[in-house]
């Protein structure tokens, strides 16, 4: 949070210098012009804190989390490019497929649902569809002031609590956000 907060003056200056704003019009619900770079401080803070946490607690986990961090970085960079220069839908989908592939083919996939173990191909397909679906669901509501941030906060808080109750270290990464 502190890194995000400290980065805001620089982000506002960059938005002003390069005129990177979402301008108010009759279809927008925000009042005034809003920087399109708001997520930059949050994303950079998240990546720095996550990598620092992993390296300071158990550096052997770095390569376990690297595909997920890399996928997040790819989605972030192309999301930023899309905010500044609108990308075609096919380009966004290809980027999502590449990022999702990083995650899945590094062994991160749904292996079971409840007590039921998933067949390998179903596991890959379900994980792929879920990741792409979540990316697009959040992208869809991103233009609605406060909704995406509120839903993200609620989701991460819930996951953090679930991981804490199950003694999973991923809880710390959830709470870093």
Residue ranges and their predicted role:
Residues 1-177:
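"…together with the soluble PPM/PP2C metallo-phosphatase catalytic core" -> "…together
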């Amino acid at each position: 949070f502190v890194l995000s907060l400290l980065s805001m003056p620089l982000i506002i200056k960059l938005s002003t210098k390069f005129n990177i704003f979402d301008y108010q019009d009759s279809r927008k619900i925000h009042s005034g012009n809003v920087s399109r770079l708001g997520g930059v401080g949050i994303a950079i803070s998240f990546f720095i804190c996550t990598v620092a946490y992993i390296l300071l607690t158990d550096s052997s986990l770095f390569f376990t989390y690297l595909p997920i961090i890399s996928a997040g970085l790819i989605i972030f960079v192309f999301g930023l490019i899309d905010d500044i220069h609108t990308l075609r839908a096919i380009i966004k989908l290809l980027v999502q497929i590449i990022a999702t592939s990083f995650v899945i083919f590094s062994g991160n996939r749904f292996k079971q649902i409840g007590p039921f173990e998933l067949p390998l191909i179903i596991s890959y397909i379900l994980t792929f569809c879920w990741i792409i679906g979540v990316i697009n669901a959040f992208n869809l509501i991103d233009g609605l002031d406060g909704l995406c941030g509120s839903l993200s906060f609620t989701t991460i808080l819930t996951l953090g609590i679930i991981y804490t109750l199950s003694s999973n270290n991923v809880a710390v990464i959830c709470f870093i956000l």
